[in-house]
Design a protein with these regions (language model features):
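Catalytic phosphate/metal-binding cores of nucleic-acid and nucleotide-processing enzymes, i.e., regions
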Residues: 3-132
Length: 132
């Protein structure tokens, strides 16, 4: 057996704003939770997945300075996640922001609506279809 496959990674890399939270980001301390996504994260956590949150929050505000984001933004993020009982194993700040008219392209990506409505098997089939 291939040594790299001995420990199969089961990780979800999840965006924060507009995915785990609802869209209104005028006050990050009071932003509404997306309960459907949070419930699904708990489900995947129970299946043994690691939950890694990756966010572009405040990348414009601090002009990409991750050190300032770690000081000023990360404590607000962890407090909000804990208050809303969001499972997470890691938080990665400094995700490049695509702008208002750009978007992210990834061959293993699913949209929040697909994540909440599809089974793990359906999601895997969706991703496998991208590789064909």
């Amino acid at each position: 057996q291939n040594a790299s496959r001995t420990h199969i990674m089961k990780k979800l890399i999840v965006d924060l704003d507009g995915t785990i939270t609802k869209g209104d980001t005028s006050d990050y301390r009071k932003v509404s939770p997306n309960l459907d996504v949070i419930d699904k994260l708990r489900f995947y956590k129970s299946l043994g997945y690691e939950v890694i949150i990756q966010t572009a929050r405040n990348m414009r505000t601090y002009e990409g300075n991750v050190g300032k984001i770690n000081i000023h933004t990360l404590p607000i993020i962890t407090e909000w996640l804990d208050q809303n009982e969001v499972p997470y194993d890691e938080i990665h700040v400094g995700k490049p922001w695509c702008g208002f008219e750009g978007f992210y392209v990834d061959d293993r990506a699913v949209r929040p609506s697909e994540f909440t409505q599809m089974t793990p098997e359906e999601i895997e089939e969706l991703i496998a279809g991208e590789r064909r």
